[in-house]
């Protein structure tokens, strides 16, 4: 976590301050350290989401925010000065867009673990703007089921109206739940399935601080597998018409994707450690059963905090 660096960057955005509403959502805090830090930034609002889980926090942000466009990032991210301007420009250029994602580059590559994360795929999705949309009658799952290609939750923005129309984030997904991820992937899919456009805008750039040690990297890679397959299960359960596409994607991911990476780990064991591939593979199988458990957990959390708005 480097919240101070994140907020310093947001304070330096090349965008009119009176048009910005910056909110820090403190998720299930155990102390007042975040509140104390945020108090140093007069233009930043602080709020608490007592229910543990990243998607609960995102939903709190949706309720608290005042703008027509809501941009999300994380506390281990430093936004480029032109981040918000590029997001706003992409929405203006694409009136049918309900989501804009952006380029995520490493803030540093100082350790072997950070270099390995980039070699494994990282968060970067290229340097060309792309617009994705599903035509009427097309299967969103068949065409764009692998939504990780569009970006990541560390750099995504939505029109507020989309949440009013299609609902907020699923609190059974992502960090702080048994699924450990998938909330961003599921929302990208929801955007495309609704018929709206999703824009990848590389000019909307942020820098992410990757895990510095190998054990943390291995855990992250395993959680990627858990989160991705939890997203597939959730999508298959929610949209029966997409079930076959999700099954096909899951089978392809388990066999072709992982077998190819295992082969690379044999050819280049130092550059591409096999235990990272196996960690993601184990996580993928684990993810097949995690979503149901996470739904029960989210329901329990909702009952314990039933006075909180959903």
Predicted regions, residues:
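Glycine-rich, basic loop-to-helix element that forms the pyrophosphate-binding segment
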Residues: 33-35, 49-65
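Acidic donor-binding segment of Leloir-type glycosyltransferases
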Residues: 7-48
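Short, flexible, basic/aromatic active-site loop/helix in glycosyltransferases
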Residues: 121-148
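Non-catalytic, C-terminal membrane-associated alpha-helical segments of glycosyltransferases
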Residues: 220-226, 240-310
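Short aromatic/hydrophobic "clamp" motif used to bind/position activated sugar donors
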Residues: 70
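Conserved donor NDP-sugar-binding/catalytic core segment of glycosyltransferases
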Residues: 82-123
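A short, conserved alpha-helix in the catalytic core of glycosyltransferases
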Residues: 149-167, 172-204
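The conserved acidic donor/metal-binding loop of glycosyltransferases
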Residues: 74-78
């Amino acid at each position: 976590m480097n919240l101070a660096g994140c907020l310093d960057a947001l304070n330096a955005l090349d965008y009119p301050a009176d048009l910005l509403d910056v909110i820090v959502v403190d998720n299930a805090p155990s102390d007042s350290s975040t509140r104390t830090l945020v108090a140093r930034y007069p233009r930043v609002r602080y709020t608490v989401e007592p229910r543990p889980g990243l998607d609960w926090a995102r939903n709190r942000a949706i309720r608290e925010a005042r703008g027509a466009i809501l941009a999300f990032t994380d506390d281990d991210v430093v936004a480029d000065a032109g981040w918000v301007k590029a997001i706003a420009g992409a929405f203006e250029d694409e009136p049918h867009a309900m989501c804009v994602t952006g380029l995520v580059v490493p803030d540093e590559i100082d350790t072997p673990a950070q270099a390995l994360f980039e070699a494994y795929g990282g968060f970067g999705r290229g340097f060309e703007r792309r617009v994705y949309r599903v035509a009427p009658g097309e299967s969103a799952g068949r065409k764009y089921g692998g939504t990780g290609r569009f970006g990541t939750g560390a750099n995504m923005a939505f029109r507020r109206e989309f949440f009013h129309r299609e609902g907020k984030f699923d609190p059974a997904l992502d960090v702080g739940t048994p699924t450990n991820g998938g909330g961003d992937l599921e929302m990208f899919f929801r955007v495309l399935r609704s018929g709206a456009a999703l824009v990848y805008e590389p000019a909307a750039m942020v820098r992410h601080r990757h895990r510095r040690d190998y054990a943390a990297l291995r855990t992250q890679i395993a959680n990627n597998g858990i989160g991705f397959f939890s997203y597939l299960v959730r999508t298959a359960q929610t949209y029966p018409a997409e079930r076959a596409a999700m099954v096909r994607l899951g089978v392809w991911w388990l066999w072709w994707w992982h077998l190819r990476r295992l082969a690379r780990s044999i050819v280049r064991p130092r550059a591409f450690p096999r235990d990272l591939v196996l960690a993601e593979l184990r996580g993928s199988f684990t993810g097949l059963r995690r979503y149901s458990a996470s739904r029960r957990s989210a329901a329990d959390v909702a009952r314990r905090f039933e006075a909180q708005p959903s």
